[in-house]
């Protein structure tokens, strides 16, 4: 097989383009060479079997049988399927063939494997006119990209898992340095302040419970003392946070006005507004007054008539009584 690989390496320039003969002891296929791409597209089944021992010819026939009835055709952007086991399942063989053709190792993460599979055809197309250093540069760029992605993921995980006072300090910085392009929502600030006050109350409960568990002995527990100090440090930061929220809310709302100044208090009732008197209204009102005076006069006259009539009747009755006597 070593000799077979050498024969293929020597036949590379005849196909057109002269690539580097990267020999593989057990596979017999070259990785990069213009001879595989140019010419008539060299096929493994049509390789001349000169300078080959019968044992090597038999191994080549077995490889042709594994590749299919038409023989394995050399792919310009792939490495030959080396190391296929006859006892493997067809699916496993296909996966190994694809991985070997794309040049992806088995231990690579899926992101790098996908990147190399996408870059594989581009590398294969440029094999006839490109050399080995360009492929190495592309591989180095891919490795740098994958390293950057891993560093970003680690940084995100590290920044998201910082509990306690560090998270409170970050929130304080976010509140104290708001985005000028974003408007401050008073409702959200009020809700954040309410949550902060509840957090302060819960921290005080934890402090009281920790102080309650301390026993008045000569040997004090340093862990409890450190825990209480940490609680007080967190409470101090939370109070600063509440103060910042309070200042932001006061700046966003209008000035305070007393409620009594907004309510109009009046001791005396307002005078009634007189209706405008037109000429017709005045005439009717004057006629009404005249009618009232006329009625009063008639009433006085009727009263005088009644009084006179009563006196006359009284005199008539007196005269009749005097006559009978």
Swiss-Prot record:
It is found in: Nucleus. This is Mediator of RNA polymerase II transcription subunit 30. Residues 1-26, 109-176 are annotated as: Disordered. Residues 158-169 have a biased composition (Gly residues). The gene is MED30. It comes from the Eukaryota. Keywords: Activator, Nucleus, Transcription, Transcription regulation. Component of the Mediator complex. GO terms for molecular function: transcription coregulator activity. Component of the Mediator complex, a coactivator involved in the regulated transcription of nearly all RNA polymerase II-dependent genes. Mediator functions as a bridge to convey information from gene-specific regulatory proteins to the basal RNA polymerase II transcription machinery. Mediator is recruited to promoters by direct interactions with regulatory proteins and serves as a scaffold for the assembly of a functional preinitiation complex with RNA polymerase II and the general transcription factors. PANTHER family: MEDIATOR OF RNA POLYMERASE II TRANSCRIPTION SUBUNIT 30. GO terms for cellular component: mediator complex. It comes from Drosophila pseudoobscura pseudoobscura (Fruit fly). Belongs to the Mediator complex subunit 30 family.
């Amino acid at each position: 097989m070593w000799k077979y690989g050498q024969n293929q390496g020597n036949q590379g320039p005849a196909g057109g383009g002269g690539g580097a003969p990267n020999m593989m002891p057990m596979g017999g296929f070259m990785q990069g060479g213009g001879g595989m791409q140019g010419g008539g597209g060299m096929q493994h089944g049509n390789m001349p079997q000169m300078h080959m021992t019968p044992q090597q010819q038999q191994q080549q026939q077995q490889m042709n049988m594994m590749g299919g009835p038409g023989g394995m055709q050399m792919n310009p952007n792939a490495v030959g399927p080396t190391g296929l086991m006859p006892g493997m399942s067809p699916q496993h063989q296909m996966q190994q063939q694809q991985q070997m053709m794309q040049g992806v190792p088995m231990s690579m993460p899926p992101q790098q494997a996908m990147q190399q599979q996408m870059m594989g055809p581009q590398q294969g197309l440029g094999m006839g006119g490109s050399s080995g250093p360009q492929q190495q540069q592309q591989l180095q760029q891919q490795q740098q990209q994958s390293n950057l992605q891993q560093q970003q993921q680690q940084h995100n995980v590290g920044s998201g898992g910082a509990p306690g006072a560090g998270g409170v300090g970050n929130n304080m910085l976010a509140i104290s340095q708001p985005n000028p392009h974003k408007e401050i929502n008073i409702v959200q600030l009020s809700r954040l302040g309410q949550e902060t006050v509840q957090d302060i109350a819960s921290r005080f409960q934890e402090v009281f419970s920790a102080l309650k568990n301390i026993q008045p002995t000569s040997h004090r527990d340093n862990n409890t003392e450190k825990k209480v100090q940490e609680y007080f440090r967190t409470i101090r930061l939370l109070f600063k946070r509440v103060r910042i929220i309070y200042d932001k809310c006061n700046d966003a709302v209008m000035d305070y006005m007393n409620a009594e100044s907004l309510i109009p208090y009046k001791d005396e009732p307002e005078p009634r507004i007189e209706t405008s008197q037109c000429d017709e209204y005045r005439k009717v009102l004057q006629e009404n007054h005249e009618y009232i005076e006329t009625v009063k006069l008639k009433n006085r006259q009727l009263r005088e008539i009644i009084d006179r009539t009563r006196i006359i009747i009284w005199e008539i009755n007196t005269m009749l009584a005097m006559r009978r006597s």
